[in-house]
Curated annotation (Swiss-Prot):
One of its GO terms (molecular function) is (3R)-hydroxyacyl-[acyl-carrier-protein] dehydratase activity. It comes from Lactococcus lactis subsp. cremoris (strain MG1363). It holds the Pfam family FabA. PANTHER family: 3-HYDROXYACYL-[ACYL-CARRIER-PROTEIN] DEHYDRATASE. It comes from the Bacteria. Involved in unsaturated fatty acids biosynthesis. Catalyzes the dehydration of short chain beta-hydroxyacyl-ACPs and long chain saturated and unsaturated beta-hydroxyacyl-ACPs. The active site is at H51. Disulfide bonds: none annotated. This is 3-hydroxyacyl-[acyl-carrier-protein] dehydratase FabZ. One of its GO terms (cellular component) is cytoplasm. It is found in: Cytoplasm.
Amino acid sequence: MTEVNINVTEIMEALPHRYPFLLVDRVIDIAEDEITAIKNVTINEEFFQGHFPQYPVMPGVLIMEALAQAAGVLELSKPENKGKLVFYAGMDNVKYKKQVTPGDKLVLHAKFIKRRGPIAVVEAEATVDGKLAAKGTLTFALGR
């Protein structure tokens, strides 16, 4: 992979997501079919208002969404996909191993393992301090 420093402004050029649903802050490594990105988790996240006010924990499905968005940055930054959208079509074999809380730096890693037409399958994992927080297999459909 190639070390890069793609900031949130550049990420928003690829992804249609915006606050409060943009869950990727920076891309640090990128290759043809692989990406590593960062989500800095803060107490100011909207979801912490209800999950849970006395014990804030990032919802697992939002960790998977952050991984999907990282993979989307990779796919939508390719010139041939400019102006298209990536639709999250499914997830399999998802495991949550560690709670993600305010102050954590969530490292998002996604690798495309299979493509067939507009459908792609990605192996993804999220870590905090080098420890696995979540992993799973994500399916995408490239559209529009």
